[in-house]
UniProtKB/Swiss-Prot annotation, chain B:
Gene from which the chain derives: rnf-145
Chemical reaction(s) catalysed: S-ubiquitinyl-[E2 ubiquitin-conjugating enzyme]-L-cysteine + [acceptor protein]-L-lysine = [E2 ubiquitin-conjugating enzyme]-L-cysteine + N(6)-ubiquitinyl-[acceptor protein]-L-lysine
Pfam families: TRC8_N, zf-RING_2
EC id: 2.3.2.27
PROSITE patterns reported in the protein's UniProt record: ZF_RING_2
Keywords from the UniProt entry: Golgi apparatus, Membrane, Metal-binding, Transferase, Transmembrane, Transmembrane helix, Zinc, Zinc-finger
Coiled-coil positions: none
Start-end of RING-type zinc fingers: 592-630
Comp. bias intervals (Acidic residues): 659-672
Source lineage: Eukaryota, Metazoa, Ecdysozoa, Nematoda, Chromadorea
Name of the featured protein: RING finger protein 145 homolog
Amino acid sequence: MAGYALKRLMTEYKELTTRPPEGIIAAPIDEDNFFEWECLITGPEETCFANGVFPARITFPQDYPLSPPKMRFTCGIFHPNIYADGRVCISILHAPGDDPTGYELSNERWSPVQSIEKILLSVVSMLAEPNDESPANVSAAKMWREDRAQFEKIADSLVRKTLCLPASEV
Amino acid sequence: MEGVMENVGGLMQNIRRRHMSITEMTEESVRLGVAQMDTGFKKIKEMSIMVLETGLRLPGLLFIELLWRYQGFSFEDISDDMMKQTPLSYFDIPTMLDFVHRRNFDHHAAIILSYFVIFISLMFLTLPLSRLIRMYSHFLSVFLFGVAYKLSAIYVDLEMKTGEEELKLDGLIKLERHGFHFLAQMLLVVLQSMLLEVDGEPWRVALPVFALPIVARMCGCPMDKLKNAHNYACTGTMIFIATYMLYRAPSLIKSTKTALRQIKAVFMVHGLADGVAVLWRKLRILELLTFTWITMFLMVLYVELIDKGRTWSEVGRILLTGVAETTNTPITLAALAVSVSYVCKWIADLTKLITGGTRSHGHVLAHSGYTEAVSVVILCIQTGFLGMQVEQKTILLALVLYIVISALLQSLFEIIEVVLLNLPSSPTASRARHARCICIALLLVVIPFFTTKTMLALLPIDIYTAIIIANSATVTARAIGVILKYIVLIVETKSEEPWEGIDDLTYYIDCANKGIELLAAKVVMVFGCMQVVKVGFSFATFAILLFHVIVNIYKRLEHTVSFIKNRNAAVKNINRLSKADVVQLREREDVCAICFIEMKEEARITPCKHYFHGPCLRKWLAVKMVCPLCYTYMKEDDFDSKSSSSGTLNEVQQNEEGAAVEENPENPEEQPEAPNAERAPGDMFDWDDLFGFRAERETRNRNEQRIHGARDMWPLLVDNDAYESDSDAGSEELVIEEENNN
């Protein structure tokens, strides 16, 4: 039933085009393939990721919205909840079903009433407030807890890298 | 925030503009063009090398084939009448036989000649391309030596006929014969020098030995001594060849050692199985077998059509006779299998090219034609195909080829099914592509009928033909089902609101398909039982029937029953919820939170008072029995209490009970005992291996069918490998927007 998912993706694309949320740009890669989207996420204000623009890619399954999509950043980003290869680990993208480890409540996992806009807003919120209790990047989580200045320094260098600016002289 | 966004946007545009300057674009374009040209040249070169290498290696297999075919004969038994019966009759066989008979070969010479031919054939098959070309040049130089010998003999005969005792060069006209012969000898010497790559002055001086009679005659040699000069030249040639071979022998031994060392390295690096695969690919055995079989088959067709004067109306029987006559040895059997494999692979690739479908996720062997090839080999081996007469081989080969066609049709169906079910959801697919896919699906409906008709005309009705007919009927039914599903999906894509009847239609199509499959299987079983009663009991037929009952009837029945049960459970879940009225929907002016489309005609109300489309909610409840919005559990007792409490709100309740009628499986008839009469061993046709392959295919089909049938109920099919070990803690406060509740 790929047509069912396609209609919903088209509706969401129309909605994102007419009422784009602040700091987020998302669209399909090309008109032939609505199941692969590309998006730009702006780092939230007053955080170490501020002024950064991070490209990411979202891949939708054929039975969307019954199953969640997969999201990964295509630039190098250093964050406790993002794997080294860019995959995003966030509760809204986890498949519905009770978490056996007990960290997540079931109503925070994927549901068909979620949308691309909510996914991206959750990712922006994750950038602002990392969750270091069950990290995807252990070294980033440890650094964020124990050496915040170093973490912010690395984040700032990554922001400059995404903007193609020279490295900071600090 | 907006100011920062504008600055960032402008900055990024400047950065992009600086990065994509005209110069860099130009350089990149030139680089890409050069790379594409290089790639094209490389591909053309590889293709040319492959064709050249295969063509050069072809005589090796042909020689081995001829040796195997005539290994039982001796030279005295070979006669003109027998040779004219063979496919090689348009060669100059009588002249060769006359030559052989007049030479009076004895037994030992024949053995030596056979070993020499085998050695040459193995060299053809195993040498690298450069050395293969050099070997051909050596053969050509030997041929040139023969030409030189012939010219020298002609010269001596001509001089003998003139009768002049003393050669007097008193006019230019008398130099004509001598000069031309000398010039011809020099030309041959130059060609040989280039071919043999002679690198030494003594070798070059020794080459023009057949010019000796001419020089001797021109120096005043008497007539009776001229033959001695010719004999000296022949002796010199033989000495030269022997010396050349002895001179080259150390190089040959060294090359052999190097080759063995390389082979050992290949096995050490890749292991045994992969090493065999590497050698197989490097020696181009597949291409060799295919070209060998095609060459012999074309020769047989030429003999049948041109020499025997048959017409084109007997093409089918001519083709079968040709295939039967060319398949006499294990080499040609392997060649036939490989050819069948390549033909099936080309047909499958052509179908993919026409439909524009991507490569499916099935096993790689399933789409390369290897299944058909292995089926051909195993069936021919088990029936003793190689030892049969031509008529028996023709009939059995027709049966084998129809089995191959049946397997090929199923492969094509697997290709077209994936493409047709995904095509309605791609927005920019052209109408031509839709038309092509529909045409191929219609061909899959028509071709099984044509195959069945021609098969019944050629072969008697048997348990084997019955199974082939059942498989053809199955392919036809599945193709019709895929076309109907395609139409339903097209209608769904073009409709505005999700259509509740669409799942019902898909479900009924699947049920009809499964019913037809079960019906065909039962007909085959009944026919087999009747044949056991009539003809008599045989272990082969009993084994076939038992395997058929287990694989085709019992497992399909089990799968169908589970499919129906899942469907009824889903229908029952959605029918417990009450339907919303059209007036209610107009008052709310709401959209379904699952598909984001307005609810105008139809909606279902959950116990927690949330509205969704019926089809959308049914799909989600198959994944998880909770409300998508508020995650309230919806259990069976909650339905009853909520629906009774909602009755007090004066809402219209329409509780439709789903049709939970389950089909009772019929018990298969017990097979009656028949008198124990065994058939001839040649008619024993063991289908276990064929059913092994077919069962494997049906296992994959069943898995795909289960996935596809289960997708109608939208179960959870996400691979959890990415999120296996790491799970995010629940510290994030994600407030679900309740706009839909307003």
